[in-house]
Amino acid sequence: MESLTDPSKLDSGKEPHISLIPNKQDRTLTIVDTGIGMTKADLINNLGTITKSETKVFMEVLQAGADISMIGQFSVGFYSAYSVAEKVTVITKHNNDEQYAWESSLRGSFTEYREFYKSLTINWEDYLAVKHFSVEGQLEFRAFLFVPRLAPFELLETRKKKNKIKLSARRDLIMDNCEELIPEYLNFIRGVVDSEDLPLNIFRETKDQVANSTIVQRLWKHGLEVIYTIEPIDEYCVQQLKEFEGKTLVSVTKEDLELPEDEEEKKKQEEGKQKTKQKKNQSLRTSAKSTYGWTANMERIMKAQALRDNSTTGYMAAKKHLEINPDHSFIDTLRQKAETDKNDKSVKDLVILLYETALLSSDFGLEGPQTHANRIYRMNKLGLGTDEDDPTADDTSAAVTEEMPPLEGDDDTSRMEK
């Protein structure tokens, strides 16, 4: 193409031709042409780079204003020569450069493959074989699969991992060991599969469950953004990562969480006698843990440990503090009933039920779920007008009339804060 736009580049041989010279004795095939030749930079870029992007060159030439009809019609696939030859030598001379010779044989190796394999497997030895391929269709992905030179140490173990194929999306690691990518009998293969089409979203059910929390909704009303840390490992990471880019990470379930407030709200809090948080929301109640101690997620993880330290659980699972909205009609009615009769069992049931329900809504667990269920049964019977002393009632509710904590006093405080 350059010779057509600038004929002076063919001054040394204006008659374009290609000669094929076979040599049966030396088993060689020589191809001679009278082209414009290549410079040293051309040899490095065009012949020394195997993965040179022709699409990128096409776009650059097209943006420069070249004739689109002449792009991509002068290449015959240089590396197809290695399908019949063990060594290829190119001798070329460009008008603006010296004569150079480029030579390559099939005995070469891929250094970048070796370095990538060692960094991927933490192995000091080279691989035995490699397969690099791409798949296009409904789901497009690229894969690097390596066969190790030696069998893995855990090959015959009964509790070994099924495979060690890493799955990534847009070069972001998604899974360290994706079992669905390769059969179990090929678990000795190491590699990476990368796709541009994999979604990077968490399960919507889990996200919606966290988003419906009354604590999160309260932050949204203040116009604050919330980071969802729903995976078990997130709890450990956040405990070590105290801040990010100068911003302190704060758990929304902590008691010392401070939110923006106006002057009127500050004044109302100072005058109030009950413990409330910065801004009243539409929720009837919520539950927050104390400043020091485990969050609800961390408490659930630690209680699931078979070899946990029970002494640590005692003080790390600290007191829970019930936060209420004193302006809500339910709280106001409950207060009036308590003032009328402090020994009313229904009031005591409602107070404890309110606290236990707040624990559940804040992802804390209940030590006695059956007691909680029986308390709900009693409130249902009260709502239906059923006499609790009716002999036809099931024995379960009667048997569950556990000792009710008094409405006031130290015993009630310890029960609520335990």
Curated annotation (Swiss-Prot):
- Subcellular location field: Cytoplasm
Region called Disordered, residue ranges:
255-289, 383-418
A Pfam match is HATPase_c_3
Gene Ontology CC: cytoplasm
Where it mainly occurs, coarsely classed, is: cytoplasm
List of residues binding ATP? D33, K52, F78, R204
Give one GO term, molecular function aspect.
ATP binding
Tell me which UniProt keywords the record has, alphabetically.
Answer: ATP-binding, Chaperone, Cytoplasm, Nucleotide-binding, Stress response
Gene3D superfamilies in the record: 3.40.50.11260, Heat shock protein 90, C-terminal domain, Histidine kinase-like ATPase, C-terminal domain
Composition bias of kind Basic and acidic residues appears in 265-274
Q: What is stated as this protein's family in its record?
A: Belongs to the heat shock protein 90 family.
**How does this protein assemble?**
Homodimer.
Q: What does this protein do?
A: Putative molecular chaperone that may promote the maturation, structural maintenance and proper regulation of specific target proteins.
Q: Under which name does UniProt file this protein? A: Putative heat shock protein HSP 90-alpha A4
Q: Which organism is it from?
A: Homo sapiens (Human)
Q: Name the lineage.
A: Eukaryota, Metazoa, Chordata, Craniata, Vertebrata
